[in-house]
């Protein structure tokens, strides 16, 4: 068994909260494999390429990946080439603002925001 029924249900719940973002992102694809479960595939559309695939181990793992992607969007938007834990106060405020709708629906995963900002995981 790839995931317990409870684990798969929780992954599906996180997937649903981030559904629009998952559909629209040009940077990754979330795929299902009968052999390994959910796979986070790093891709590019311009130029077209497929990079690395990482198995999603848990709902927290998927939520972390999605929240990290939201934060990276802000850093790309500002044109600053630095790590998330080095974000300036304006970037941090925008990242937290963009995280809020997701964390409001997934409050059990709010701790991941702190982990991301502290460079953990």
Predicted regions and their residues:
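Short acidic DE-rich linear segments
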Residues: 117-121
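Negatively charged, low-complexity tracts enriched in Asp/Glu with abundant Ser/Thr
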Residues: 1-32
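Acidic, low-complexity, intrinsically disordered interaction modules
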Residues: 34-111
């Amino acid at each position: 068994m790839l995931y317990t029924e409870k684990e798969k249900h929780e992954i599906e719940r996180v997937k649903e909260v981030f559904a629009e973002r998952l559909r629209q992102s040009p940077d990754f694809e979330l795929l299902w494999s009968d052999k390994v479960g959910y796979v986070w595939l790093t891709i590019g559309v311009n130029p077209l390429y497929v990079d690395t695939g990482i198995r999603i181990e848990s709902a927290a793992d998927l939520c972390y990946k999605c929240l990290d992607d939201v934060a990276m969007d802000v850093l790309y938007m500002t044109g600053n080439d630095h790590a998330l834990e080095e974000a300036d106060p304006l970037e941090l405020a925008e990242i937290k603002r963009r995280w809020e709708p997701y964390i409001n629906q997934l409050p059990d995963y709010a701790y991941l925001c702190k982990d991301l900002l502290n460079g953990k995981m």
